[in-house]
Amino acid sequence: MASYGKASLAKLETCHKEIQAVCFEVIPVFDHTIIWGARGEAEQTRAFEEGFSTKPWPESKHNAVPPGLSDAVDIAPWHTTKPHIRWDATNEFIYLAGHMMQTAAMLGIQLRWGGDWDRDHDLYDINKPFDLGHFERIA
């Protein structure tokens, strides 16, 4: 059974408690790592300037302003062999998203997934840019 390492736990602790609840339910079923929780101004600016985010500071759900808990998390499927993260394994990200979204629904938590921004379950319409590891809380 999979569990989070220290680095993933530290990042997950920066996320809203509802996001944490979903992630803790999914990790024993589908091994994954936490890439980002909350991002400070410098981290968000760098992510935006390098094209890893479409939102400048403080517009991202990763930005907890005032300082608090992030309304977003970025995760990726984790493999025990290298490379541990396989960014081109689209099907694995989609499968992980299914676990995340179903678990959130069972817990009564509303999430939006970066592979289905408009939440219509059609991945091939207007869902650009794809951000398959991104999940954000709908408050």
What are these regions, as identified by a protein language model?
Residues 1-33:
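Active-site acidic/histidine clusters and adjacent loop/turn architecture
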Residues 9-15, 43-48, 93-94:
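Charged, low-complexity, helix-prone segments enriched in Lys/Glu/Asp/Gln
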Residues 24-53, 106, 114-118:
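Extended, low-complexity, intrinsically disordered C-terminal regulatory tails
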Residues 60-139:
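Catalytic cores and adjacent binding grooves of peptidoglycan-active enzymes
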Residues 6-8, 54, 117-118, 136:
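Polar low-complexity intrinsically disordered regions enriched in Ser/Thr and small residues
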Residues 51-62:
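Cytochrome P450 catalytic domain signature, combining two hallmark sequence patches
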